[in-house]
Regions:
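Transmembrane-helix signature of polytopic, membrane-embedded enzymes
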Residues: 17-20, 97, 106-128, 146-147
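Signature aromatic-anchored transmembrane alpha helix within multi-pass, membrane-resident enzymes
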Residues: 18, 196, 318, 391-396, ...
Length: 637
């Protein structure tokens, strides 16, 4: 039987994806073998949510701790739970799978931009920096949203290539946008990128741009007759702003604008602004209703003037978006989500902007590219053979990345200027490599919170694409240098990865070491003493609950909690213990117990060889019920 070209393509992509996945597994083997020891509290919190769901618990669309992050990454762990059993390894494997899909989808992207560089970019992304390797063993959904981001780009390119006449591509674009927003609102950088490219490459942009200048708006305002109409025109602007704010809050989860710590605007409540908007609309209609029908008729004429195929495609796009974002919509209608939250808080104080820019350029971007740690080692190591090898490889990698970026920007300098000036663009798929990094860096700089490596994750893919394109141009001139550059890249990544494993203790003399698991000892103690419910710090509560497979339910002993559903469940349990490892918390509990309870038991559980590697377990409390209940939330935090 002869397979058609489409089936062959599907099979080749499937095989390629599996090869990438297993190559990534091999490079991450020390971390995966020590998955219990490398499980983070955030991962454990998400894993507990999925474990409760599998055990028959209620279904929620979001985790306890946030409304900007759906449970897609956790649901992806269910097949691994069913095959491998509930555990850290099964929860971490989806992160590797997502990164494999991200690499495969990047291959598809490069096939549209520079087909000869597609395989090269796969190799470059497999041999990543230690920072990227670490992130792709943590099931935070970062690789997943980057994969969905690539699908958004690919769908957008197909829509542009077909002139928006293919309803299926518009449906896919809408679906991936909606589902990306639900999965992780970080998708906004991808949505913003295609929005900029769509607007600037639209044939009507120059005409529209000429009508939105300050001069045109001011003259239109002055042309209004009478004070009432002028006031109504201002009110129209306020109503438009309210509409956009409400839509943004419902879709993305709200935003906040601060200057020097002072809140200028917060968009947190979901339903309250809708009522305010209706009041404004009613006031507007009462003041001046004569032009309302004109505006409605203008809207109808605009819709009717659109070609039927385009109109059909737009409807399919909205349908796809509605289906993709349906989990978030359902969470709002069921009452699970009642606040937009502060998902996009920005602070425009100059010192904040300068500080974030400096951190970005001197630490976080070098860390994403794998240059931060080796450059630091140049100041620590003595001048031996490894020192000069390290210096040589750093020079090669910096040269490759620098030359690739400079070459790409200089050949598209007109596009760069037009993007910053908001001038019309002649569309080219490669332009996303200009817009996406600009949006990511700008978002990190203006963010109220400090920069983080995970928010720069897509830059790794962008740089890999640019280097792959540059190497393909070099290959036509010198295949020897092309091969040498690839070997240097892979060697640099491998050495840095090995150094990281050695430093963490997971590898010694090229052998993988199984690290001791501190949590197993405290869980063993709980099982021996029949402790089924306890309160502890964030890490111990989340990780301990998951590693015990829910047999020991541990909630946070702080007044402010992340896993509030877990704490609500334990509130009705009278028999509980307090597990403490923090010195400050130990003093607080010891003082409170001695001063407010009649009696209690205290046990010390040694979990390591270090002097501070101990847990203190308080249980068997005797005293007034109110005094005992206050133990559940004694720590401020």
């Amino acid at each position: 039987m002869i397979l058609s070209s489409k089936y062959k393509l599907v099979i080749l992509n499937l095989i390629g994806g599996l090869v990438i996945f297993f190559a990534l597994i091999l490079l991450r083997l020390p971390v995966l073998i020590n998955s219990d020891q490398n499980l983070t509290a955030d991962e454990a919190l998400m894993a507990n949510h999925i474990m409760d769901l599998l055990n028959g618990g209620p279904f929620y669309f979001y985790y306890d701790f946030a409304r900007y992050f759906g449970i897609t990454n956790g649901l992806a762990a269910i097949p691994f739970f069913l095959i491998l059993g509930v555990g850290s390894l099964a929860f971490k494997l989806p992160a590797v799978c997502f990164y494999a899909l991200y690499i495969l989808s990047t291959y598809w992207l490069v096939k549209k931009i520079h087909p000869q560089a597609a395989l090269t970019v796969v190799l470059l992304m497999i041999f990543s920096s230690p920072a990227i390797l670490s992130l792709t063993t943590m099931n935070y959904g970062v690789g997943l949203i980057c994969f969905l981001g690539n699908l958004i780009f690919l769908s957008f390119f197909n829509v542009k290539e077909t002139g928006g006449t293919k309803a299926f591509y518009c449906f896919l674009l809408g679906f991936f946008i909606g589902f990306g927003i639900y999965t992780f609102t970080y998708a906004i950088v991808y949505i913003g990128s295609i929005l900029i490219l769509f607007v600037l490459s639209n044939n009507s942009w120059n005409t529209f741009r000429s009508k939105i200048s300050i001069k045109v708006i001011a003259s239109g305002y002055m042309a209004q007759k009478g004070g009432v109409q002028k006031f109504v025109s201002i009110l129209d602007g306020i109503i438009l702003f309210f509409i956009l704010t409400v839509l943004f809050s419902y879709v993305f989860g709200g935003f906040g604008i601060d200057i020097a710590g002072f809140s200028i605007m917060q968009s947190n409540e979901l339903h309250k602004p809708v009522g305010q908007l209706l009041v404004l609309v009613i006031i507007r209609i009462c003041l001046f209703r004569q032009d309302v029908m004109d505006k409605l008729n203008s809207t109808k004429r605009l819709i009717r003037s659109t070609a039927p195929l385009i109109r059909r495609s737009i409807l399919f796009g909205f349908l796809g978006f509605a289906i993709g974002i349906a989990p978030r919509t359902a969470s709002i209608f069921t009452g699970e989500t009642i606040r937009g939250g502060q998902g996009f808080d920005v602070d425009f104080v100059p010192t904040n902007l300068v500080n974030h820019f400096w951190q970005l350029m001197t630490h976080y971007i070098p860390d994403v590219l794998g240059l931060w740690a080796p450059i630091l080692r140049l100041f620590d190591y003595r001048m031996n053979l490894f020192y000069f090898l390290n210096l040589f490889l750093i020079a090669i990698i910096v040269l490759l990345i620098g030359r690739a970026i400079v070459l790409f920007i200089t050949t598209r300098w007109k596009d760069v200027k037009d993007i910053f000036r908001l001038k019309a663009l002649s569309f080219n798929p490669a332009q996303f490599l200009l817009v996406l990094p600009i949006l990511i860096c700008a978002a990190v700089i203006v963010s109220q919170g400090p920069p983080a490596t995970r928010y720069l994750f897509p830059l790794h893919g962008v740089v890999s694409i640019l280097v792959a394109i540059y190497l393909q141009k070099i290959r036509h001139k010198s295949k020897i240098f092309f091969t040498f550059a690839l070997v240097a890249w892979c060697m640099f990544s491998s050495i840095e990865t090995y150094q990281g494993y050695v430093k963490s203790g997971m590898v010694r003399n090229f052998s993988i070491i199984k690290l001791p698991d501190h949590y197993s000892k405290i869980l063993e103690f709980c099982n021996q003493h029949k402790i089924l419910h306890a309160y502890s710090d964030y890490d111990t509560s989340a990780i301990g609950t998951f590693l015990s497979k829910g047999n020991v339910q541990i909630a946070e002993y702080t007044k402010t909690v992340w896993a509030y559903k877990s704490k609500e469940r334990l509130a009705g349990k009278d028999d509980f213990a307090i597990i403490v490892r923090n010195e400050s918390a130990l003093k607080n509990y010891q003082k409170y117990l001695d001063g407010n309870l009649h009696s209690y038991s205290k046990n010390i559980v040694k979990v390591g060889n270090g002097i501070n590697e101990v847990y203190y377990v308080f249980s068997s409390f005797k005293g007034e019920k109110g005094a005992i209940d206050r133990l559940r939330s004694l720590i401020v935090g």
